[in-house]
Each structure stands twice: as C-alpha cells, then as structure tokens.
Amino acid sequence: MPLRPGRCYRHFGTPPYTRLEYIKSNPPVLIPKFDLGNPKGNFNTVLKLVVMRPGQIRANALEAARQHANKYLTAKVGEANFFLRVAVFPHHILRENKMMAMAGADRLQDGMRLSFGTPVGRAARVEAGQIVMLVKVDAKNIDHAKEALRRAASKIPLPSRIIVEQAQ
C-alpha cells in the first residue's frame, strides 16, 4: 500500500507512542545524519527554523528538508562554510489501521474490530516555538542560509518562520 499523505499525521490528539519494548516491529529512523557541514567551524550568525503551531512532522518530511537544505548550502556556500543541524528526533511511532477499498472487502477485513493499527513510520512531535533546524554561517552567507531554510520549510507540514541571531 502507498504512503498516506502527510496531512493525515499533521495533528495529534493521542498520547505519544514511543515505548519500543511494546512494539513488535519498530520502523527505522529515516534520517541518517543530524549534523552536517563543518561542526567545528567558528561562525558568527545562527539561523533557526521555528514552527509556529504544535503538530507532528514525519521523518520523511524531516529527511526531505534536511537533504534539500544541505544540497543548496553545499552548492552555494561550500561544505566547510556552514553547519546544519536537525534539532528534533522522530520518537513517535505512527500507526495505521489498513483498510481495503475494493468490491467484497467487507468479507475479507474486520472493519473497526481490533483497530489499533500497525507501525508504518515515525514522527517528531513539536510545540509552537520549537526549533526544527539550525544553520550556522558567516555574515556574508546569511542570504544563502535563509534561502536554504526557506526551501526546507516548504517540506515541513507546519507553518514556520526563520529567526536570525548573532552567535555568542
């Protein structure tokens, strides 16, 4: 079955489902690296991608945002001239009660009986004002970092904004 759209998992109304000892098949974390670029660089500007509403961000969306921002920054600024961090981790396990949509499906499936669902993916639960991504650059590369975070924000299902600060 194909993956459901991200809007199906954007909001949450249930407690987090994170206890892996109770889950028979836990889905893998699809984000291979959370820190990219030059972590030891001495940069004077920090740009943060902050969400404005509470919600869930699927690991697929976080990975797409990370790849897009990293590719743009590597091409425009260079690998040694930025540091990018994904600041949230997808702890929450997403479940889906799979349903058939065909003729005679009512004879083959149980409907809402035992409808807890099976694990299909992971998501990060975020609150309003929480940092999702962080980019450190020099002052001359602020415009490129803003564009990279703007492109990353288009992959995230929640409204967000970019905050620019001077590094301490």
Swiss-Prot record:
Coiled coil, from the record: none
Any one GO MF annotation of this record: structural constituent of ribosome
Disulfide cross-links: none
Pfam families: Ribosomal_L16
SUPFAM superfamilies membership: Ribosomal protein L16p/L10e (SSF54686)
Keyword terms, alphabetized: Ribonucleoprotein, Ribosomal protein
Protein name per the record: Large ribosomal subunit protein uL16
Protein species of origin: Thermofilum pendens (strain DSM 2475 / Hrk 5)
